[in-house]
Swiss-Prot record:
Organism: Vibrio vulnificus (strain YJ016)
Residue positions of motif Meso-diaminopimelate recognition motif: 412-415
Protein name: UDP-N-acetylmuramoyl-L-alanyl-D-glutamate--2,6-diaminopimelate ligase
Gene Ontology BP term (one): cell division
Lipid biosynthesis in keyword set: no
Annotated positions binding meso-2,6-diaminopimelate: 388, 412-415, 463, 467
InterPro entries on file: Mur-like_cat_sf, Mur_ligase_C, Mur_ligase_C_dom_sf, Mur_ligase_cen, Mur_ligase_N, MurE/MurF_N, UDP-N-AcMur-Glu-dNH2Pim_ligase
Residues that bind UDP-N-acetyl-alpha-D-muramoyl-L-alanyl-D-glutamate: 30, 32, 158-160, 186, 192, 194
Subcellular location per the Swiss-Prot or TrEMBL entry: Cytoplasm
Length: 493
């Protein structure tokens, strides 16, 4: 049963308003279109939309009260009425939202693990949840591929939901028996305070490379946003990738840091490192050493960065006290994440690997990872998103030309931009104009590659991963790389 609280108690940390005790808050809602009879509407000033413009609409929808961000006309602490509905104004409401929602949903008590970084967040959160389930502990995830238990994920609009959604979802998950939840924590989510009131048992840093500069402006601002997971949330354990330049620097600054590396470290360093890594078609075998002792594991994942992902997940769970032998014994039962280095293969045709790689660093790592598994030619099919960072377009084309034997440029959510102009930006990164084929339709691009590839080739279909849509100028249409691979290879879904 959902928790309720009277408005006086809900606002107690910021406002003394005993006259509002007879108003019951049962659900907070940020979107006026979603307000139902008896909901409390929260009107914040967002980065795009000012929720205060929709107060009247929320009241018409049945809001029983409104909590709004203050302004010069309506200062902090003001209580007024509109159509007999109370409106209370708070200063910097956007920064208080996480705590406000936490009070209503009683700050769900479970082990929270926050994972931040440019790449690897989804894989690591899902590996952590899988491993905990295999160890007998009910665990959930929140992130790009959805929220909830792995066998019943509910779609998510953003990597990190809004502050109210997060607290509401955690309360629901706790009610369903979750003992731990692994959350993808995006830089946007950190800057906008969406996880401000959460206390993390562990935080994980994967890596930092070019992404979201259209939002943050500089790499320095992007890095600073990520760092706040460890400096402002009292993480008991900070699991840091030492093989990343930024991670190595942060490790020196964080007292609670546990390092992770694919390379041997000095015994005095508080870290877990690989003493040997073997890659095969059946997966990755890692022997490790360090502050948690020695061990060996095998998991059916492919690619060097998945070796790092495995060790980051392992170090996190060991730091939280999960039995080491139970983790090593169950590693072979771990499964790849949908759309993350996901292999589709049949006899007599090239292998197709679907991956979410949509940044220069991710594309480079994906191609490098597949090269060690590839006995024939390596193909790269990818595009770049419209209305996003244009600077990465030539960079990604240069990487593909350098690391793949064949390059096919295609569309990936062109949005309001002309797809041909996006491709022109990518072509600028090539040293030879004829080193890439252009096919705007993704299905046709994969069909072209399969028609021209040999059986021992590997085709990387990058950019969409788990997504099942293509965002065009005036509409969003259904499209899935995974479904395309299955259809063209004749694999039943």
């Amino acid at each position: 049963m959902r928790n309720t609280m009277n408005l006086t108690n809900l606002l107690a940390p910021w406002l003394d308003c005993p006259e509002l005790a007879d108003i019951t808050v049962q659900s907070l809602e940020l979107d006026s279109r979603q307000v139902k009879q008896g909901d409390t509407f929260v009107a914040i000033v967002g980065h795009v939309v000012d929720g205060r413009q929709y107060i009247e609409k929320a009241i018409e929808q049945g809001a029983n009260a409104v909590i709004a961000q203050s302004c010069q006309q309506y200062p902090p602490g003001l209580v007024r009425y509109q159509q007999n509905v109370v409106i209370v104004y708070l200063e910097k409401l956007d920064e208080k939202l996480s705590q406000l929602a936490g009070r209503l949903y009683q700050h769900p008590e479970m082990s929270l693990i926050g994972v931040t970084g440019t790449n690897g967040k989804t894989t690591i959160t899902q590996l952590i949840a899988q491993w905990l389930e295999l160890a007998g502990q009910k665990a959930a995830v929140m992130g790009t591929t959805g929220n909830g238990f792995l066998n019943a994920l509910q779609p998510a609009a953003n990597t990190t939901g809004n502050a109210v959604e997060i607290q509401k979802t955690l309360a629901d998950l706790q009610q369903q028996g979750a003992k731990a939840t692994a959350l993808e924590v995006s830089s946007h989510g950190l800057v906008q305070g969406r996880v401000k009131a959460l206390q993390f048992a562990a935080g994980v840093f994967t890596n930092l490379s070019r992404d979201h500069l259209d939002y943050h402006g500089t790499m320095e601002a992007y890095a600073k946003a990520k760092m706040t997971l460890f400096t402002e949330h009292q993480c008991q354990h900070a699991i840091i990738n030492l093989d990343d330049e930024v991670g190595a620097q942060w490790f020196q600054e964080l007292q609670q840091g546990v390092g992770v590396s694919l390379f041997p470290q000095d015994a005095s360093v508080k870290a877990l490192w690989a003493s040997s890594v073997a890659y095969a078609e059946s997966g990755i075998t890692i022997e490790f050493d360090g502050c948690f002792g020695q061990g060996r594991l095998h998991a059916p994942l492919i690619g060097e960065f998945n070796a790092t992902n495995l060790l980051l997940a392992l170090a996190t769970l060991l730091a939280l006290g999960v039995d080491k032998q139970a983790l090593l014994d169950s590693a072979a039962s771990l499964r790849p994440v949908l759309g993350r280095m996901e292999l589709f293969q049949v006899n007599s045709k090239a292998k197709v690997v679907v991956d979410y790689a949509h940044t220069p660093d991710a594309l480079e790592k994906a191609l490098q990872a597949l090269r060690v598994h590839c006995t024939g030619h390596l193909w790269a099919i990818f595009g770049c998103g419209g209305d996003r960072d244009k600077g990465k377009r030539p960079m990604m084309a240069e990487i593909a030309e350098r690391l793949a034997d064949h390059v096919v440029l295609t569309d990936d959510n062109p949005r309001s931009e002309d797809p041909a102009m996006i491709v022109q930006d990518m072509l600028a990164g090539l040293t030879r104009g004829d080193s890439a084929v252009v096919e705007h339709d993704r299905f046709s691009a994969l069909q072209y590659a399969l028609d021209n590839a040999q059986a021992d080739d590997i085709i990387l279909l990058a950019g969409k991963g788990h997504e099942d849509y293509q965002v065009l100028k005036h509409q969003t249409v259904h499209y899935s790389d995974r479904e395309s691979a299955q259809q063209l290879l004749g694999i039943s879904s």
